């Protein structure tokens, strides 16, 4: 978001059949920040004869800007981050050539380097101005096991995601099931999530890792490892803050103006997300959705005393669900009270949210789709 309009190129060697060595590089120039930015990935694939269908060694990196300040300045300053993430993925051989089951295990390490602002008084005019300094370096180890059954009817998947560093351990289990109706291209979708968070040093400031906590509604400030594409990661108001992601709790309503948003937990969180195709044809790809979540000490943390947060409404899917717009029509009391206290008008529009499912370098398992987009 802070880099705004960017121009650059896309350099890649993607083709079918896949080559052992593949790369995608996207160097760009940001006209807003007047600096070079970009992202890219290198990968080398090994195809063993036994046990594994594929072993992929990859390195993903990017550098963009994630915040700005123009306090008492004629020209704003922008904070940059750098990310390096080497990984190895093991795709296990199926039991037979006709098997619809696929299992994979990924090990990944993240290095995140961020700049930060230090605000200090300028002795020349006694005004407080920001200064860019080197911020904290973040490290994360991640293990993801994914099981998929891509059968024609009622396919399902589940994944175990374990994240850890010197400050915390977070474990998440997500399961998804599509129940096909007896109608073409009509189905009922079920997603369930359960997560547990362990904090290694309870005496440290919770502010330093609050974005790593489990959350019912996943927004840009929760994506501290910069895996997703967000239009604004740090703002608390404006239409860009209406962007969410279908991660962790999967709820659709944001409460960013609270010091501690509803549904944030440093202990455990569980949720279920339901959506259904409409039984009749419609020019737009509309679905109905309903979400519910509960978490540790919910009755004490929710202002209403209720143990469950929920929302439901209509969603519009566009571009093969790469852009999804959510319109909540019903919600739990805590969400209603937040909406009344924060939004003076246009509450229905303010409660709307959208998700961008755009991960440019998840192409190792989706190469046919990305080749179509690149042509």
Positions of PLM-derived features:
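Outer-membrane beta-barrel initiation region
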Residues: 1-53, 91-101, 117-154, 261-272, ...
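Transmembrane beta-strands of outer-membrane beta-barrel pores
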Residues: 1-4, 13-15, 27-33, 44-46, ...
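Transmembrane beta-strands of outer-membrane beta-barrel proteins
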Residues: 21-25, 53-59, 99-107, 156-160, ...
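C-terminal outer-membrane beta-barrel translocator/porin domains of Gram-negative envelope proteins
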Residues: 38, 54-77, 84-90, 129-278, ...
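Flexible, surface-exposed loop regions and adjacent strand-edge segments
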Residues: 74-80, 120-127, 206-213, 303-308, ...
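A structural signal for short secondary-structure junctions
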Residues: 265-268, 279-282, 306-310, 317-319, ...
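C-terminal structured domain segments
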Residues: 300, 304-341
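Outer-membrane beta-barrel "beta-signal"
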Residues: 316-322, 345-375
């Amino acid at each position: 978001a802070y880099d705004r309009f960017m121009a650059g190129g896309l350099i890649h060697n993607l083709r079918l059949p896949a080559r052992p060595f593949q790369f995608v590089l996207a160097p760009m120039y940001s006209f807003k920040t007047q600096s070079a930015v970009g992202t890219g990935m290198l990968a080398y694939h090994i195809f063993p004869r036994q046990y594994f269908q594929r072993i992929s060694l990859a390195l993903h990196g990017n550098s963009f800007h994630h915040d700005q300040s123009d306090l008492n300045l004629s020209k704003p300053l922008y904070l940059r981050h750098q990310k390096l993430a080497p990984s190895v993925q093991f795709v296990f051989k199926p039991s037979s050539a006709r098997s619809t089951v696929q299992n994979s295990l990924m090990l990944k390490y993240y290095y995140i380097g961020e700049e930060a602002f230090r605000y200090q008084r300028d002795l020349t005019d006694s005004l407080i101005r920001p200064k860019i300094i080197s911020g904290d370096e973040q490290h994360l180890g991640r293990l993801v096991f994914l099981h998929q059954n891509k059968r024609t009817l009622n396919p399902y998947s589940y994944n175990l995601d374990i994240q850890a560093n010197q400050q915390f351990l977070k474990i998440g289990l997500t399961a998804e099931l599509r129940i096909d109706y007896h109608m073409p291209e009509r189905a009922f979708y079920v997603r369930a999530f359960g997560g547990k968070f362990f904090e290694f040093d309870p005496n440290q400031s919770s502010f330093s890792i609050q974005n790593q906590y489990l959350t019912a509604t996943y927004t840009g400030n929760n994506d501290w490892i910069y895996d997703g594409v967000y239009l604004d990661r740090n703002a608390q108001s404006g239409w860009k803050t209406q962007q969410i992601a279908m991660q962790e709790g999967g709820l659709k309503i944001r409460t960013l103006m609270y010091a501690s948003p509803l549904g944030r937990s440093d202990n455990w969180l569980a949720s279920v997300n339901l959506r259904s195709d409409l039984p009749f044809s419609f020019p737009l790809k509309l679905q109905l959705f309903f979400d519910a979540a509960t978490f540790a000490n919910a009755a004490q943390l929710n202002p209403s005393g209720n143990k469950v947060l929920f929302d439901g409404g209509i969603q519009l899917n566009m571009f093969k669900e790469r852009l999804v717009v959510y319109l909540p029509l019903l919600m739990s009391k805590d969400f209603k009270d937040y909406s009344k206290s924060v939004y003076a008008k246009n509450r229905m529009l303010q409660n709307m949210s959208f998700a961008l499912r755009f991960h440019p370098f998840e192409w190792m398992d989706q190469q046919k789709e990305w080749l179509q987009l690149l042509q």
